[in-house]
């Protein structure tokens, strides 16, 4: 945390990371109330990613009181190349959550065409595309491919947990179930705390029965107040 505070003196990234540390319960207590104020300070310092994030959160009412007009004003004010690109990323989420999935997909496809190969934002776009797919429509392989592409760029992204879950639940993907356990654990160490519950619950199954491990992982899930989802 002290490192974040030192970085925050000259970079908004420090403020954003400070908020993330609290939201991820790195210090034994998860407190999401820190997230928006810290990101807002990062945005005020001109950190492009935070500027777009705050615009989206304010528009949707995530981690703060909803104010669509303020969110729109912030979206319109995005000016740096980084902020504009992240703004498009969040615009796609806004379209998706208001029911316009086709427009969200088009925004993401256009954004991928615009972003250079290897850009970190590409990983987030691929992950979002995977999350948006409906497994009920038989798009499991396509969803897994999106997560795999995201992890090629950012190996510790949150999509680790989702990919592991697909590998575990859908044998048609051709992946051994043991691999899912490895990836869930990797996701945990990357800060995806809900992965603990997947490990805890599945270590209770007869095929993988290991009660000490099940208890250990369920306790970790409880520590961070994560639901099994």
Where are these regions (language model features)?
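Hydrophobic face of amphipathic alpha-helices that form TPR/SEL1-like repeat modules
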Residues: 18-24, 53-60, 88-95, 129-135, ...
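Residue-level detector of the short coil/turn that links helix A to helix B
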Residues: 26, 30, 66, 99, ...
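Alpha-helical tetratricopeptide repeat
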Residues: 1, 85-95, 119-121, 125-128, ...
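Short helix-capping/linker turns of helical repeat alpha-solenoids
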Residues: 4, 9-14, 24-26, 44-48, ...
């Amino acid at each position: 945390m002290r490192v974040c505070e030192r970085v925050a003196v000259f970079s908004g990234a420090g403020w954003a990371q400070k908020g993330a540390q609290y939201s991820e319960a790195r210090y034994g207590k998860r407190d999401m109330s820190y997230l928006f104020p810290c990101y807002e300070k990062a945005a005020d310092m001109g950190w492009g990613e935070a500027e777009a994030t705050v615009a989206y959160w304010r528009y949707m009412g995530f981690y703060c009181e909803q104010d669509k007009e303020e969110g729109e004003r912030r979206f319109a004010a995005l000016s740096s190349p980084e902020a504009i690109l992240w703004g498009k990323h969040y615009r796609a989420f806004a379209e998706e959550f208001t029911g316009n999935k086709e427009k969200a997909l088009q925004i993401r496809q256009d954004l991928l065409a615009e972003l250079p190969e290897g850009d970190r934002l590409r990983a987030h776009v691929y992950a979002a595309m995977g999350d948006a797919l409906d497994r009920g429509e038989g798009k499991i392989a396509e969803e897994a491919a999106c997560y795999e592409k995201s992890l090629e760029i950012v190996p510790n992204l949150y999509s680790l947990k989702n990919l592991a879950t697909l590998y575990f639940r859908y044998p048609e993907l051709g992946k051994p179930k043991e691999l899912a356990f490895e990836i869930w654990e990797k996701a945990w160490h990357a800060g995806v705390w809900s992965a603990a519950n997947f490990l805890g619950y599945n270590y209770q199954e007869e095929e993988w029965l290991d009660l000490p491990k099940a208890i250990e992982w369920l306790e970790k899930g409880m520590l961070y107040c994560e639901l099994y989802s």
